[in-house]
């Protein structure tokens, strides 16, 4: 169990970090292979996209697990507001643009693709910043 309010249990921390990193990596791989036409080393674009979809489902579950305690505690403590809320806004926008990619009108598809990968890269920056701040803070305390 967590030692302080808002700190995630170790299993949850690994689940959140793992699912978000896998989702980010597969998203970047798909972007490089499909949009920038880099030759895939092992996987074809459809396989990468399938893995991205599966890891996005896990990342959405991770988001749900964080909302109940971690986010609430962070808001109350007013710590890491920019990186935390930045991640939340980006994730909600990523879910919206993903829905537009699959269910939206064809004329919005290209805009949704561009928005999805730009927001995805922005999200990864917020996520890494959030993680690095926590890591530096933990090292300073020990």
Which residues does each predicted region cover?
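Membrane-embedded alpha-helical bundles that constitute the cytochrome b-like, heme-associated redox core
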Residues: 1-142
């Amino acid at each position: 169990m967590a030692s302080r309010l808002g700190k995630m249990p170790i299993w949850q921390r690994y689940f959140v970090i793992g699912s978000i990193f896998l989702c980010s990596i597969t998203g970047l791989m798909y972007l490089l292979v499909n949009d920038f036409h880099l030759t895939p080393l092992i996987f074809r674009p459809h396989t990468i996209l399938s893995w991205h979809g599966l890891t996005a489902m896990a990342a959405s579950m991770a988001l749900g697990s964080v909302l109940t305690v971690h986010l609430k505690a962070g808001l109350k403590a007013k710590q890491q507001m920019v990186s935390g809320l930045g991640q939340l806004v980006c994730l909600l926008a990523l879910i919206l643009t993903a829905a537009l990619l699959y269910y939206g009108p064809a004329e919005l598809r290209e805009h949704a693709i561009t928005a999805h990968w730009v927001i995805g890269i922005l999200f990864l920056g917020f996520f890494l910043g959030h993680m690095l701040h926590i890591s530096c803070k933990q090292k300073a305390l020990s």
